[in-house]
Design a protein with these regions (language model features):
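Gly/Ala-rich phosphate-binding loop of Rossmann-like dinucleotide-binding domains
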Residues: 1-3
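Short loop/edge segments at beta-strand edges and connector loops
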Residues: 45-47, 125-127, 169-171
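A structural signal for isolated positions on well-ordered beta-strands in alpha/beta enzyme cores
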Residues: 7-9, 87-89, 124, 144, ...
Length: 178
């Protein structure tokens, strides 16, 4: 996104405040990726979550653990109940069990948001392979952006596509997730 002139804000969860402080003290060198995060990418502690999500945003990218799905559903529903929820792009893969059936995590998030009063959700997913270290170092990779609505998938794919991060799109959300 940065290479396509989009503003990027990264907001950590409440569990990542110490990590964010260390990152900033270390001149934005990410310890796990061993690469510098560009100054144009703004990194915030969770205390800025509400303020940033209430600004004019086109896309919320969710890079949370599978155990954090309920938490993020709580946070999003708290802010967007009765409002339009921006497009979501979920990086998290996996399955959950609901009423003795397997459910994709994108479906779980949608169910939780609807249960919490978000009438309209628009959740996309990305299928790789693409590793964070490769992306941070601009290693060529190819991904598929999937959404039940092909136009949304195409819009997000075009937003993210660069000369090293190659995107295609699909309306087969379940197929890309599995």
């Amino acid at each position: 996104c940065l290479d396509n002139n989009h503003d990027i804000n990264i907001v950590g969860t409440h569990l990542e405040n110490d990590f964010i402080e260390k990152l900033k003290k270390n001149k934005n060198i990410h310890p796990g990726l061993n690469t510098e995060i560009p100054d144009q990418i703004k990194i915030f502690k969770f205390e800025k979550f509400d303020e940033l999500l209430n600004s004019n945003i086109d896309l919320i990218v969710l890079g949370i653990s599978s155990k954090g799905i309920e938490w993020v559903a709580d946070q999003l529903s708290r802010l967007f109940k009765g409002k339009n929820l921006p497009n979501l792009l979920m990086l998290t893969k996996g399955l959950s069990i609901h009423k003795n059936n397997y459910e994709l995590l994108v479906d779980k998030l949608e169910r939780l948001l609807v249960d919490k009063g978000i009438a309209k959700t628009n959740i996309s997913a990305v299928g790789g392979p693409c590793l964070a270290a490769g992306l941070a170092n601009k290693v060529h990779s190819s991904v598929v952006i999937a959404n039940k609505d092909i136009n949304t998938a195409k819009k997000i794919a075009n937003m993210l596509n660069t000369n090293y991060y190659h995107t295609s799109y699909s309306d087969d959300l379940n197929g890309v997730e599995v």
